[in-house]
Amino acid sequence: MPFLETIVELAPRLRRKEVSPLELTRACLDRIEKLNPTLNAFITVTAESALAEARAAEIEISRGEWRGPLHGIPIALKDLIDTAGTRTTAASALYQDRMPTEDAEVVRWLRQAGAVILGKNNLHEFAYGGSSLVSFFGDVHNLWNAAHIAGGSSGGSAAAVAAGLCFAAIGTDTAGSIREPAALCGCVGIKPTYGRVSARGVIPLSWSLDHVGPLAATVGDAAAVLQAIAGYDSLDAHSADVPVCDYVSVLREGARTLRVGVPRAHFYDDLEDEVRAAVEQALAVIETLVAETREMQIEIPTDRIVQNAESYAVHADHVARTPDLYQPETLRRIRFGADISAVEYIRCRLELDIERRRALNIFAKVDLLVTPTTPMPAPAIADLKKDPEALRPAELILLRNTRPFNVWGLPTISVPCGFTKSGLPIGLQIAGPHWREDLVLRLAHAYEQAVNFSAK
């Protein structure tokens, strides 16, 4: 069953023509047909074009025109990433028939790498939430227990990867929306440095905080996808012209020389017992893999005014004209930004830039930080829906540990580190200095190899 293999394992087999891109694509489409009615991970499945892309990849590979490790690999996209000729809805009635005429830059790079696009993943409407329970197309469910959330806002992407509906997915992360669902669904999700991956052609939530990155089954697969999409886009005002290293090759360097910081305050406060136990076990393993671990204190930044003001700026015209096309909870959140003054926003936006410079000081004596990704495992859907006032507080708790790294703009990954007694996944978060995705990936890979949770 090819869906049990990783991209890293399949790539050389595809190149040697031992496995067919058509075989992989059909296997994914079969699993989508079987499991998507339960998970609701996909809004749109582009079966016909995916099979055509797979056939084209097969022909190219047969001619010796292998493009790299993503050639012929089926991948999905969060449905706020533009795709030419395929609707991009942001999980909203407002955009249910929106048909882009151009691919987002990240999609263009994936196509250049030879990836097969399977379709568009469900999400929390306009990426404004951490549960994926607010979507015009219905709730996303967790593979490990369909009565629990998949997280958000990239909930459909995480659920699809965890269930083997695709080999990887591209998500977005404004406060944790790649890492939190990856943790809750038991897969790997990396938020690169702010500006590392182009966000041009991605429907924004907050320009200053939005990041684009991959979700995958393993660290190696996430590295392979990140390799294909990282780079400078001169037409994206937030893109940075910083060299990209070979993320796959650096995994072989291991973590033996790395120094790890453990910021106990905030990140380790008020953890559920099973999360605390799993993370402490993970730290014990990491101590055997690295040069040094040390506890440290970090001042935690805030971003609410920037996010609220920018999200309102994105939606103000539609909110004024067609408020009924938004889900009520999304509309309420967007309106948080309506009364923020220009003076207040500019001051807070300047402070965000200062915080990103201050983040350099975090790594004066350590190379990486390690924290729990979320303070608790995936909540039950029924618990969040029985009280309308319970949803946002629960989401804020789930995103508590991921949010600061969006303010700092630091590269950060979530990797599986255990399960609760009821079988729900638990995630470990690793963060590094700006532009040092390589360090983050090295420790994540070394830990993954030591514990082998991905095999489960």
Predicted regions and their residues:
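An N-terminal boundary/leader segment
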Residues: M1-A52, S62, T288, K456
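Structural helix-boundary/capping segments
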Residues: K34, Q112, A162-D269, E280-L289, ...
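Short helix-loop capping/hinge segments that flank enzyme active sites or metal/cofactor-binding pockets
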Residues: L70-A90, S249-P263, R294, I305-L360, ...
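Long amphipathic alpha-helix in the N-terminal Rossmann-like dinucleotide-binding domain
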Residues: E48-E58, G114-A115, H124
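Short, well-ordered beta-strand elements within core beta-sheets of diverse protein domains
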Residues: L10-R16, L94-M99, D210-A217, I334-S341, ...
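Conserved hydrophobic/aromatic pocket- or pore-lining residues that grip, position, or stack substrates
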Residues: C28, A50, G72, K78, ...
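Short glycine/serine-rich loop/turn segments
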Residues: L70-V212, A265, T371-L391
